[in-house]
């Protein structure tokens, strides 16, 4: 079963801003997410995020692309079988998570 993947407008821009090799890796990861976006504790690919420093991300998940140093932060909407991509970016300190927090607040998620 494939889940529907939706993007915040800013996440689309994140994807466009990556170089070609990074974009390929991210698209591959998004394809896996579409197949099984559940948390690892339920046999999926995502890891739960929590509340750290200024980022209040409890209830959201992430996927790490370790080799590329990229992170995808998303929200799982089970009742609609949807994945909402919040941010796609390089993890520099906690910058990607702080940006996710800003977008969550801006979009009222």
Give the positions of each predicted feature.
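Residue-level marker for the onset of beta-strands and adjacent loop->beta junctions
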Residues: 1, 59, 70-72
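A broad, low-specificity signal marking well-ordered, structured residues that form hydrophobic/aromatic
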Residues: 5, 61, 83
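Enriched for short, Lys/Arg-rich terminal
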Residues: 13, 64-109
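A structure-centric signal for secondary-structure junctions around beta-strands
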Residues: 2, 27, 57, 80-82
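A general secondary-structure junction signal
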Residues: 5, 47-49, 67, 89
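Short, conserved clusters of charged catalytic residues that mark active-site
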Residues: 10, 55-58, 69
């Amino acid at each position: 079963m494939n889940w529907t993947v939706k993007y915040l407008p800013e996440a689309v821009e994140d994807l466009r801003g990556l170089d070609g090799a990074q974009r390929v890796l991210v698209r591959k990861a998004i394809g896996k997410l579409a197949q099984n976006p559940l948390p690892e504790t339920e046999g999926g690919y995502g890891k739960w995020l929590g509340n750290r420093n200024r980022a209040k991300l409890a209830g959201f998940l992430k996927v790490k692309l370790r080799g590329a140093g990229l992170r995808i932060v998303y929200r799982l909407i089970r009742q609609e079988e949807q994945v909402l991509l919040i941010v796609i970016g390089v993890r520099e300190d906690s910058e990607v998570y702080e940006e996710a927090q800003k977008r969550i607040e801006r979009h009222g998620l």
